Curated annotation (Swiss-Prot):
GO BP term, pick one: negative regulation of telomere maintenance
Lineage: superkingdom: Eukaryota
GO cellular component term of the entry, any: site of double-strand break
Protein name as catalogued: Uncharacterized protein YGR042W
Organism name: Saccharomyces cerevisiae (strain ATCC 204508 / S288c)
One Pfam short name: ZGRF1-like_N
InterPro entries: ZGRF1-like_N
One GO MF term: enzyme activator activity
Length: 271
């Protein structure tokens, strides 16, 4: 398509945020067909940046000749531009390609990407023939490899599909004596609770027995004290003549009296 192109003499810089900037000479091209700006270096004619401007207000401000050599325009994201004057204007044919249209591959490239299928292979419609073909194919291993596997793995022919964690079956060990404490045969939580409850019951039973025995012993002591009191009262009632006779008998026999020893007889009370 034919487009009108205008070339401008300009100065550009990439120091966007500095107060004292260094400016370089360049050329700016403007395409009226698609409102495109292109920035080139003056010496080497190297393309530095290109940008499309859609906003009409921005276009008028950039192309206004009153702002030449005065205003700084940020046409590109990385450069500031000051337009000086117009160099030349001309028309040229330009191939405009839409950016949103994707170039799809041709049929030849699609055919190359597809896998090559042999004529002898069965199709999907003939399922029975496909099964027959796959059933005829067998995977065989050499005899040397089988013997090595049997020797290394304890006589068990383990295929590649089995997991490495799996091992041959081993019988459980038998416990010979019941008295041997084995950590693997520890009681469960329920049996532990029962064992904890039984000693508590035993303690409560023994405490009740001790309390009843103490009460019985106190009753017996009270009875004994009552009998002793009655006997001592009877002894006090004795006459002085009996005591004198006892003393005389002891002096004749030559025995020395150590103390008054009395025999206390406990008799049951009729309660």
């Amino acid at each position: 398509m034919l487009s009108h192109i205008v070339e401008y003499e300009c100065q550009y810089t990439d120091q966007l945020y500095k107060k004292r900037k260094i400016w370089h000479d360049g050329r700016l091209k403007y395409f009226q067909l698609n409102n495109r700006f292109m920035l080139y270096t003056e010496k080497d004619n190297v393309l530095l940046a290109s940008e499309f401007k859609i906003n009409s207000k921005e276009l008028k401000a950039i192309l206004n000749p009153e702002g030449f050599d005065i205003e700084e325009h940020r046409i590109f994201s990385q450069f500031l531009v000051i337009i000086s004057n117009i160099i030349e204007e001309y028309d040229r044919d330009i191939q405009v390609a839409a950016t949103h249209v994707r170039a799809y591959p041709s049929n030849l490239s699609v055919q190359k990407q597809r896998p090559l299928i042999s004529d002898n292979a069965p199709s999907l419609n003939h399922i029975s023939t496909a099964r027959e073909v796959h059933s005829n194919i067998k995977v065989t291993t050499p005899n040397r490899k089988q013997t090595e596997d049997n020797a290394t793995k304890g006589g068990f022919n383990i295929s590649k599909l089995t997991l490495k964690v799996n091992k041959p079956f081993k019988k459980p060990k038998r416990i010979l004596s019941t008295n041997v404490v084995n950590e693997s045969n520890r009681p469960s939580i329920r049996s532990q609770k029962i064992q904890e409850v039984t000693p508590q019951l035993h303690e409560t039973n023994t405490s009740t027995k001790v309390q009843t025995a103490g009460k019985v012993a106190l009753n017996n002591d009270n009875i004994a004290q009552g009998n002793y009191a009655t006997i001592t009262e009877e002894a006090k009632v004795r006459d002085g003549s009996d005591r004198k006779k006892d003393m005389a008998n002891l002096s004749k026999s030559g025995k020395r009296r150590v103390g008054g020893i009395r025999r206390i007889v406990h008799e049951p009370l009729g309660i």
